[in-house]
């Protein structure tokens, strides 16, 4: 029996590594699909902002603390937007998906952006854009930092 356990362990280790590798590929593919779907709705939100007089500065700004979906300007005010999409009501309200933890990450990332670009004294606000099906909801000053 002991003799059989060693080959079994080796078999499991080898196959588990392959399994982990395959799962990793699947997770990456799902993540890439989610990103590409998210990118479509971020583009729609960006178009919406442009149509409402905003100047788009950047999509998907990344720093060590996280990511900001859209950075725009509304007059002299820098607007840091989080875009959330839901396919329908059964998936939940997209605006409720921006919880306190997410707000803190966005705030820290925005702080990093302002320091990096030398605009620490600029007026800023945090908006959330919810896309539900084909409906866009824009909440200005959704939270404060």
Report each predicted region and the residues it spans:
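Conserved catalytic cores of phosphodiester-cleaving nucleases, focusing on short active-site segments
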Residues: 68-91, 106
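Short acidic/glycine-enriched loop/turn segments that link adjacent beta-strands
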Residues: 63-66
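Short, low-complexity, polybasic intrinsically disordered segments
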Residues: 131-145
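Acidic-basic catalytic patches of nuclease active cores, encompassing PD-(D/E)XK
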Residues: 7, 11-18, 22-59
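Catalytic cores of nucleic-acid endonucleases
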Residues: 7, 18-27, 85-133
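Protein kinase-like catalytic core scaffold
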Residues: 77-79, 125-127, 137
